[in-house]
Amino acid sequence: MNINKFTQKSLAAVQGCEKLAYEYGNQQMEQEHLLVSLLTLEDSLILKLIAKMEIQPEMFTGEAEKLLEKLPKVSGGGQLYVSNDLNKVLVNAEDEAKAMGDEYVSVEHLFLAMVKQPGRAIKELFRLYNITRERFLQALSTVRGNQRGVSDNPD
């Protein structure tokens, strides 16, 4: 994974994972942290795309936040780790960017990678809200058109 190929917003989302893990007392950063981070970014593209899929953004974000509360908690701080599931998403996001002809990994690539390989709780949430790759790409095409991500600040 080449962090230099992440847009400023996607880097902010990854940094948000760490912040959320600390806030919720989790030892591992999980896909749930990334999802909530993507949804709560300032001027969140993912939140706009969720709305375009005719899903109530506030309700979906609330459900995602409930998933954070279910994660194992530790006390006393210590080292923070990236889970295997989250690592797969971060690595696969680069593949998503390349497949779309983009030079940089953006928030939509992170979300698509999560749709492709969701952890158990995320998979259930996506099923509940009927979030599929096809629906997400359709919503994305209405916003993005045929633009390509060729800078680290296109979001």
Residue positions per predicted region:
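Histone-fold recognition with a strong bias for associated Lys/Arg-rich disordered tails
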Residues: 1-155
